[in-house]
Amino acid sequence: MGALIPSSTLFNIFDFNPKKVRIAFIAVGLRGQTHVENMARRDDVEIVAFADPDPYMVGRAQEILKKNGKKPAKVFGNGNDDYKNMLKDKNIDAVFVSSPWEWHHEHGVAAMKAGKIVGMEVSGAITLEECWDYVKVSEQTGVPLMALENVCYRRDVMAILNMVRKGMFGELVHGTGGYQHDLRPVLFNSGINGKNGDGVEFGEKAFSEAKWRTNHYKNRNGELYPTHGVGPLHTMMDINRGNRLLRLSSFASKARGLHKYIVDKGGESHPNAKVEWKQGDIVTTQIQCHNGETIVLTHDTSLQRPYNLGFKVQGTEGLWEDFGWGEAAQGFIYFEKIMNHSHRWDSSEKWIKEYDHPMWKKHEQKAVGAGHGGMDYFLDNTFVECIKRNEAFPLDVYDLATWYSITPLSEKSIAENGAVQEIPDFTNGKWKNAKNTFAINDDY
């Protein structure tokens, strides 16, 4: 597929049974459990082990296996470092990493060094050096990593990709995207009954993501979650495959949303009402590409708002904007020549349905119930099928490093009043001749 390490050398270090992929999980929280569910529904996967110090989450993951008629996974739950013992197991081919962001680097690098293929959940890096580490370790060990960005597989996004590849948008000029999602109920809870949004605690007093994710809003100020927005544009603009991201500039608004949420739900006397939040409510990042396109990302998760990732794809002959969560009718579209220069929007519905990506047409029924409207099926299916077929991942370690780098670079830019930051070429020039093979057929 699309990685830049030759596919013929990807898996030659493994004693590998292509009929059944033996998979383990580092972290089986709410996101990890989605992958557990998808893997448990497959006959070509054996779930070997879970590494997670949280017995409640491990119990939930084991229930998923039981529900799907699978045997219990071996558990490595003796503290934060027990995952290292799991990685010693020679009967594991691949590992899903779905841990808190600050653990991604340690877990991903350790898994590759242990010879385990990595499916890495997405976020942003803590430091730029981490991004280089992913690339260097993958190249040195020959162990591949797939970036698990599910929005690349969203149905409307893939239909637009299909139209882009058919030339309907002409030459692409500009794109926007982001993470525009009211996360306040995710960032705070009571920590008592496992329900998001039922309180205003975070950190050690909280449950699930609020235990760790909210601290990033307290201590950082940047584009914390770039991959949902940049990933789909990346596939349409051939980033790292004939094109690349060159530089960025970021700005952050004031921070008001989280404080107001705490006061409204917990009162002005609540201790967390005194917390000073560094993360701006709205962070915008403008990116310049080698081939002349521009990209604007928006991080907007601390204020009241409906869900919308804010996609815009604009070319010399077409324009699409979305305003919802991925339904076919939740967008506007315009093609100058086809619409006879009418200067009037058309609903995206008929266009999304007519140009539905062949992969969605073929696998729609398999995707039912797979999470996030079915796109998680396609994401996880690609991971497994590439391993089984000894093919390189279409979203690879170079893509992960590129996307992850946006976060620390945006933090630096904001701290320097929007100063332009150069985005490294993590491919070391290989992007010039690499080919885009993301979703090029109806298979995976």
Curated annotation (Swiss-Prot):
Q: Which reactions is this enzyme annotated as catalysing?
A: Cleavage of non-reducing alpha-(1->3)-N-acetylgalactosamine residues from human blood group A and AB mucin glycoproteins, Forssman hapten and blood group A lacto series glycolipids
Keywords from the named record: Glycosidase, Hydrolase, NAD
Which Enzyme Commission number(s) are listed? 3.2.1.49
Q: What cofactor is needed?
A: NAD(+)
Q: Which amino acids does the record list as binding NAD(+)?
A: 30-31, 52, 80, 101-104, 107, 121-122, 150, 208-212, 225
Which molecular function terms from Gene Ontology are attached?
alpha-N-acetylgalactosaminidase activity; nucleotide binding
Please name the InterPro entries in this protein's record.
Answer: Gfo/Idh/MocA-like_OxRdtase_N, Gfo/Idh/MocA_oxidrdct_glycsds, Glyco_hydro_109_C, NAD(P)-bd_dom_sf
Enzyme category, top tier: hydrolase
One Pfam family, short name: GFO_IDH_MocA
Q: Which residues bind substrate?
A: 179, 213, 225-228, 307
Question: What does the free-text pH dependence field read?
Answer: Optimum pH is 6.8.
PANTHER family linked: BCDNA.GH03377, GLYCOSYL HYDROLASE FAMILY 109 PROTEIN
Q: Which protein, by its recorded name, is this?
A: Alpha-N-acetylgalactosaminidase
Which organism is this protein's natural source? Elizabethkingia meningoseptica (Chryseobacterium meningosepticum)
Q: Top-down, what is the taxonomic lineage of the species of origin?
A: Bacteria, Pseudomonadati, Bacteroidota, Flavobacteriia, Flavobacteriales
The gene it comes from is nagA
